[in-house]
Amino acid sequence: MAANAAQQAPTQNWPYGNNSSGEGPVHENPEWEKARQALASISKSQNSTKPSTNQTTQQAGQYQAAVTDSSAMQQQQYYQQWYQQNQQQYAGYPYPYNYYYPMPPYGGPYPPGQYGVPGGYQTPTTPTGQAPSMPTMEDQSSNYPPQPPPPATPQPPPQSPTSSDQPPPPPPPPIPPQPNAQYPRPPSQTPYSPNGVLPYSPTDSNPMMRGYNPGQIRPGYQGYQTPVYQPHQQQAPAPGLYGGAGRVDAKKPNNSNMNKGGQQLWQRMKQAPGTGAVKFNIPKRPYVMSNQNFPPGEQGPGLAPPTATNPSSGSTSATSSASTGGAQTRPQDWPQAMKEYVQRCFTACESEEDKDRTEKMLKDLLQSRLQDGSAYTIDWNREPLPDLKPKQSRWEVMPQLSQENSIGRGGATRGRGGARLGNYRNVFSQRSPSSSSSGSSRSSSRSPSPHSRHRDRSRHHRSDSGSQSDGSMSSDLRLSLTRRQQKGGRGRGAERERGRGAAGERGRGRGKANRGRRNMEDLASGVGKKRKGGNAGLDFHDPNREAKKQSRAARFHTKLRTEPLVLNINVFDLPNGTQEGLSWDDCPIVGTCQDITKNYLRLTCAPDPSTVRPVPVLRKSLIAVKAHWKSNQDYVYACEQMKSIRQDLTVQGVRTDFTVEVYETHARIALEKGDHEEFNQCQTQLKALYKDCPSDNVGEFTAYRLIYYIFTKNSGDLTTELVYLTTELRADPCVAHALELRTAWALGNFHRFFRLYQKAPRMAAYLIDKFVERERNIALRAILKSFRPSVSVEYVQSSLAFPDLDTCLAFLTGLGISFTPSDPSKIDCKVSSASLTTS
């Protein structure tokens, strides 16, 4: 047993001091001197029975150290030289004694390069059937208690059967002990792999050691299980790696004295073998989802064979996975026929919507073909192009061609550019190949992520970026979609498809092939056709639409008039080539009609001078209309004649004082009869005419305009009018009265308001009559609240400016005012207030 322990001593290298620089003295355990004497006594006999250990010296020089700085290079040279010296000194003892009972030095933490620290070193290979030396320390601080003495006879592991077939080599010459042989040797510098697996040289003669897991328990100890070695595969470390080693009492937990590096190593290596998920190193531009390999028998010639992975391993080689995943869908590795097929698909597109729909269809089609390997076996030259014309309802309003770029895309006109390969797009690009010229994000369903949702071309349409809702391109695509729905019907994509009624034939009648095919075609035209917002963004303009309309209209050609009806208004050429509209100043016309009266007719063609009256005739007509109005008060006749006079002045371009007089006369007649529509039209024309032809009645009609704004409660125009009032206009009696009336109305001073109403100049009272009843209702509520319990009717009559008592009583009765039973001449304020509130 002691011989077995002696074989382990030459394979360990230990630093001296607190760090890799070897500073600080190290004290020797007295028990180790006895062990060395026992090892030296049996070195010759053991050396003859273990010939295979001679490989250790040869393989010790095969280290490939990944050293990046000068200090790490010095450490490599130091440990390599020290390791070779120890192998020469203890060449006949392949099993290190301190693997089972390690004795680290009293000192500081691990040197750089151990457990994830930069500057790792390769572990030397060992003969067949022998385990390499492993560091078993979690902490090397000086707080550890002394190491207990090792047992006398440890049980060695079973020897490989191949080692006994070789003749024993001659024993090496004795080597004098090293100067520091009394110190225990440190563990070998072994780089820590990110996957938790110790790398070994691929040139190792023993294939069993390539998948060797140093965390396995050795035979002869409690909890040992027979390891299963798998060549050319990596294994995840055992949960208890380095767990029971170190200078720690068995009764105390190992994590009590762990340093920070040991805790991180334990968290990374505590996962059991076989329970970790396969991890992939995603390339710079992922084209397909990871963790999807082709079956071995269906791979095309351009695909690399998938790397065999061990089911029990916790990770996969990042290089192999990245190269395999990138080669699956890189457009450079596509078959030439498939590239030409993609180019033909985009060439057949007529609009940007067709390109977007084609790109979405090709993404799912090519991805499914590349995954099942059929992309390298089918004939792409005979593959039919996708059908992009959607099924449109006969009741659906098709958008105009000029509106397609604005309605279908939310107002943003998109250019086509970005990631293209030749003349076709990269349909597996993660970002959209087309960008929005307006700067807004146009998210179409091109992202490979199945969990992200983007806004569709219509602002009310939503579509899933990872769903198989791209329509029927061919029978193979339809079958592949059916297989996906049957297999992944419980996934998120299928649930969202079922939620919007787009998962094949489900939700629209089972067992009907026609409806199933219609569903697939509806998916090609866009999801959510019946949703809120319509389908304006997904319709396409038919170039033959107008021709079809004309052909349908030709059925009634015999019933139409022989000559088309042409309206000649505004069709004559305007002078100076102006296209801003008809201006009567640019088309001077002098009338020749001598009729005093003329019916008013709207113009439907260019004015005829023979039907237009000149200005002298119009003056006579105005005098006749005034006389007829005073004698007959026929407003219909007067209004028709005044509008006829205004029309003749307009077509001749007459804007003189006579024009102002005509509009003022018409405004007064309309105001007297209460036609505020015609009055408002005349006021608008007078406001423009007063700038060119000032009149003595500017103040009068300015006051009418202010009172009219009070009637309409147009505070904005009223404020604007007050701003432009000059000092001369404010001094005008009509304007001054209108300003006082506005102030009383704005302040709610009803007493002053009705006093001004009774003193209104000229025709201002006609305008106030338009809203005086409204103001009387508000004033009556205020009176009833102020004069409880009763108020006389005479006071109300005088306060509200009624002309007589009968008119006041009629007004009060209409509002439901209650009078006191004892005195009918008084109003019951309490009861009347309630009736006014409810009315």
Curated annotation (Swiss-Prot):
Basic and acidic residues bias (residue ranges): 25-36, 492-508, 539-549
UniProt superkingdom: Eukaryota
Compositional bias per record (Low complexity), positions renumbered to this chain: 53-66, 120-132, 305-327, 429-450, 465-476
Domain PCI: 675-839
Biased composition (Gly residues): 408-420
Taxonomic placement: Eukaryota, Metazoa, Chordata, Craniata, Vertebrata
Disordered, as annotated region: 1-75, 106-262, 287-332, 400-553
Polar residues biased stretches: 10-22, 40-52, 223-236, 253-262
InterPro entries linked to this entry: PCI_dom (IPR000717), SAC3/GANP/THP3 (IPR045107), SAC3/GANP/THP3_conserved (IPR005062)
GO cellular component terms given for this protein: nucleus
Pfam families reported in the protein's UniProt record: SAC3_GANP
UniProt protein name: Leukocyte receptor cluster member 8 homolog
Composition skew (Pro residues), residue ranges: 145-189
Stretches with biased composition (Basic residues): 451-462
